[in-house]
Amino acid sequence: NEKYYIFLEEFDNSKNKGHLSIIILDKNGNYSKPVKFLERDYHLSYPSIFEFENQLYLIHSTIHNSNAYIELFKCEDFPFKWKFIRKLITDIPLVDATMFFHNNLWWIFAAEAENNGTSKSEKLMLFYSINPLSDNWIPHPLNPIVSNIQNARPAGNIFHMNNKIIRPGQNCFKVYGNGFSFNEIIKLTKNEYDEKNLESFKPDWKNGLIGLHTFNHDHGCTVIDTRMKRSRFN
């Protein structure tokens, strides 16, 4: 219907936790206020949508009782009604999980978190499965596949550009969400992984920007999550 549905985390400072919301954007750039569609008693963040067998699914990061893991939901009535299916990969604390299909396998890229759920943003972990709905995800033998605070943590969906596979990565050096980079995936198999940095982006292209968090592009629409410095009196 010529509209974009932007899935995002809203953080409620009064509750000290996040919930998931949707902004609807039309082709003229008009957008709605965020509409909450998923909230729990604990923190939710980083929604990632994927399609499997003509059905939409959503994974998101969760921090509950100091544990960080992934939850899987199935869409029952797009875009606001989603049904919980199961937890994924509960034995390793993970944040910012990103689903990707490649060479007949499903892959989850996620940053390893500390036991208290606070990510160091330094280690990128990789898991694979033949079925994205499975609770059997195999850790890659090279984990962590990236150990670098400047690009390890996922910063949005993996995408194709100019016949290359691009993985956005967060730069969390000095501060969380300092910027992001485009990293080309060179090898992605059950036994191999290799990537190289293509370009890094800093929050220097607009006055007031102090951080870049995520990058997503789909069907001609690009969404960048930024942080700005504002006066509380404005």
For each feature predicted by the language model, list its residue ranges:
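Carbohydrate-active catalytic/glycan-binding domains of CAZyme proteins
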Residues: 1-234
